[in-house]
Structures are given as structure tokens and as C-alpha cells.
């Protein structure tokens, strides 16, 4: 049985923010959510979050995790003091306790699984995750024997020049046999310059204690300021894009592209520069996205091309072409083999297969049939100042340039709307509708000059 305790009481002063540090976002999730997610493959029986600064705000933001338990550290007196707060709620627990920092969001689930397996296989009282840093300056060094049993931890300022050659540092992730840790936690003393209780001091009372090196030292990056948050985001993006490159996706300029973890990509998808894929987005096989596009919470079908466009909460059917400079939002449904082109905006609109909206149009609250052609400058006037109203357009209907369809309105099938028309009444099937004032010509007319008006 495994319990998880996450240290999340700190303010994060160096973030220079009113938001608790663990609630800052990294790739669409808060730091603490990422830490929690990394533990889920362990199937923990208990998940305890130790809160302090803005405790109520952290509780509120974590309501999506219904099985969490919260304990409060009213004074932030060190890591050992934080774990002491779980003693009352862990009474009678038999198993292991995994202790993690809420601001270390890049740990891989496999690393924690390996750590727990090592801990249980060797029946350790404690197992400490360590990392070999290229430049460990400022970090305490961890010393162990050839069998990876801990010998001692020495702070950087106390190391000899020879000891500073050791690159192994404490990653701040621990797995304890709870029955052993519970006995020593009350004995911790704040005998240091900071007058804090350190969890590493508890390790001195435990035996056996082993260390385990993480495979990639970037996993243990802690977030203390915005610069480190940006570094973590780049590491996270590199992981995601590397995985997709291996899976058969072409990413033409990885440094200019961002992809959320929740995105799904088919084989032979091509992502061009300056493209951003966010949220619950799915892009099917053979589609080409970008350059310069943003797609969020949308499903793009097979062999679709999206160029310099923004798509959110929408769906695009197979073999369609979107853009350049198209904006689809709020549950737009595009059929197969459609063309939606330059400077077109759609909101809450469905268009059937082989329908074209090629230029300079706004369609809102509209339903279009198949093989419809919307002329340049066509507008659905769907808002009367109070309510939104629907527009229905039948199959194979064509609207001329600069048409206005004043909703609520229905156009039948095979209708042709003359250019420049403003349509205010329903139109039956198979007709030409012209709704514009006849052109008037006044021979010999001249405008009054400005000099004449001054007289």
C-alpha cells in the first residue's frame, strides 16, 4: 500500500505573484496537478496535500481531484515540519509514503515506479531519488557506496574541494516505510541557521537507506521563478514533440511550435512553423496544419489543410481546406471536401459536404446544406440586439457577393440570391431572388462645390 504526500504550503515569493506557486500553469495544467498525475500509475490509496499559503484557494482549485486529503501547515518551518503535519491523519497506516514537492512538475511516472520498486525490493526504510547534475554548484552532495546505500549528505558550503567533484545531488523525492518514519518525525530538531526542520535529518535515523539516480536530471527541475517555469515548459514541449516525431508526425520547425499533451495526431500529419495545438484537439492522418495556425479543442479530419487560421471548439471534415485567415469558433461543423477561405468567420454554424465559403463572410447560427456556394461578403445578420436567430440554407443554393441574410430566415434548395441583396423573408426552392433598389441615373447632375456652400 502506498500513500502520497505533496508539499504545497509555500508562497513562492520569487514568482512575484498573488497566485500560490503550485497553481501556476505549465502546459495547460497547474504544477501540482502535474505532480499528482505522475503518481497515478502507482494507484495510491491516499493522496495528501500539505497546504499553507492561500490554503483555501489551493483546495478550491483542486476540486477536480475528489480523493485528495488536505492538511494545513500554518507556519512554513521546513520540509520535516511539513511532513510532521500528516502524523495525525496517518495514524494506523501500514505501507509506504512517497513524499514529493508540489513545484517539481516534470517527474515521469516511470521514474516513480522504478523508485517504489527499488524501495520495496530491498525493504528499505527510506529511498532517496538523486540526480547527477553537470553543474551541481550550490546543491548538497549525496554520498553512497557501490551498492547505492546512503553514506551521508553534505551541504555544498561544507564540502571539501574533493567532495565537490561529486555531482550527485538530492532531488527532494523520498519514499519511506511509514512505520519507520513515524517513529523519528517527532524527534526532528531545528538546529540550523534557518531554524527549520529538515526531512533529510530524519534519514539519519533510518536504516537501510538507498539512493536511486534519475535517468534524466531535467525531471527534478524545481520551479522557483518565472524563468524556471519557462525552462520547464520548453523541456515539456521537447518531450511531447520528440514523441510525435518518433510516432510518424512531421514537425517542420519544432522550436516555433507548441503541442499540448492532450493533443492526438495521426500518422503523416505535417505541422508547419508557428502553429499551436491546444486542449482536446485531434488531427487525423495526412492533414497539414499551418503555418501560423491555432487549433484548440477541435477535431480535424483526414487530409485537411489549415493555413493561417484559428479554430476552436469545432470540427472539420475530411479533405477540406481552411484558410488563410479563417476563424471558426463555438461549435462549427464543416463537412467533407469544403472550402472555407480568406477572412471568413463562423460561429455555431454547420455546413454540408462540398460547400464553399471562400471570401470575406460572417456566418453565425447558420445551417447550410451540401454544395452551397456563399459569395464574397455574404453576412448572416443573426443578432437583433437582444437575441440570436438562425439561418437555414438549402442544398445547392448560391448567394451573390455582398448579400445580407436577416435572420430568422430560411432559403430553400437551388436558390440563387442576386448580388447586393438584403433578404428578409423566407425563400422557396428553385428561384432567383433579387432584393435591392433599382439603380437610378440622373443625367447632368453635379455635386455642389465647397466654395458654393461657403456663399
UniProtKB/Swiss-Prot annotation:
Keywords for this protein: Acyltransferase, Cell shape, Cell wall biogenesis/degradation, Cytoplasm, Magnesium, Metal-binding, Multifunctional enzyme, Nucleotidyltransferase, Peptidoglycan synthesis, Repeat, Transferase
GO biological process, one term: regulation of cell shape
Binding residues annotated for UDP-N-acetyl-alpha-D-glucosamine, in chain numbering: 7-10, 21, 73, 78-79, 140, 155, 170, 224, 329, 347, 362, 373
CDD domains tied to this protein: GT2_GlmU_N_bac, LbH_GlmU_C
GO molecular function: glucosamine-1-phosphate N-acetyltransferase activity; magnesium ion binding; structural constituent of carboxysome shell; UDP-N-acetylglucosamine diphosphorylase activity
Catalyzed reactions per annotation: alpha-D-glucosamine 1-phosphate + acetyl-CoA = N-acetyl-alpha-D-glucosamine 1-phosphate + CoA + H(+); N-acetyl-alpha-D-glucosamine 1-phosphate + UTP + H(+) = UDP-N-acetyl-alpha-D-glucosamine + diphosphate
PANTHER family: BIFUNCTIONAL PROTEIN GLMU, NUCLEOTIDYL TRANSFERASE
Name of this protein: Bifunctional protein GlmU
Source organism per UniProt: Acaryochloris marina (strain MBIC 11017)
